[in-house]
From Swiss-Prot:
Designated name of the protein: 3-isopropylmalate dehydratase small subunit
SUPFAM superfamilies xref list: LeuD/IlvD-like
Pathway assigned in UniProt: Amino-acid biosynthesis; L-leucine biosynthesis; L-leucine from 3-methyl-2-oxobutanoate: step 2/4
Broadest EC class assigned to this enzyme: lyase
InterPro entries membership: 3-IsopropMal_deHydase_ssu, Aconitase/3IPM_dehydase_swvl, AconitaseA/IPMdHydase_ssu_swvl, IPMI_Swivel, LeuD
UniProt xrefs under Gene3D superfamilies: Aconitase, domain 4
Protein's organism: Xanthomonas campestris pv. campestris (strain ATCC 33913 / DSM 3586 / NCPPB 528 / LMG 568 / P 25)
Family according to the record: Belongs to the LeuD family. LeuD type 1 subfamily.
Any GO CC annotation of this UniProt entry: 3-isopropylmalate dehydratase complex
Gene: leuD
Record-linked HAMAP family: LeuD_type1
NCBIfam families: leuD, PRK01641.1
Amino acid sequence: MTPFTQHTGLVAPLDRANVDTDQIIPKQFLKSIKRTGFGPNLFDEWRYLDIGEPGRDNSTRPLNQEFVLNFPRYQGASVLLARENFGCGSSREHAPWALDEYGFRAVIAPSFADIFYNNSFKNGLLPIVLAEAEMDALFEQCLGNEGYQLTVDLAAQRVRRPDGVEYAFEIDAFRKHCLLNGLDDIGLTLQDADAIGRFEQGHRAQQPWLFGALQ
């Protein structure tokens, strides 16, 4: 998992509340067991005018020119502004996979659905909760300034505007540690690889008959 320390990126404003996981990545794309290939179908039913199917060439599909991510000014955005209860609905880890593969490093909203919030941390996507008034200010700034960028400083737990205004955000210390060091569940386990190896050696020495078939 890529470490997240500090990120400055173009901001896209998704001014919708209660965006659910089926809107983030529709159900027909969940058949794959891989973690890749979901970015092109992020917000599929909003980005395109037809119905998407797995394996289709999206370059030939008609775009919904009224959807914010299709606006030229937001191409390459890596910070997403959203409204309350982002990521609600069914539990699917594909939702943060799709956001991450599209290019988003952080999503900023007044609130998130619990399961989506937890899944995001496990997949290197930083969900940031800010107050409604702070979100309103960010939406206003973003909509009024083309090429608007924000800096997300995870170490300092600050979102910094171009004019120098900063917003503090809270994050669990363990989750912060994992993101700063790029540690997913596998990475955390590998930190104890030496201890695991010592246990296996001791276990094999004490009960060798359990390992006969492995020799």
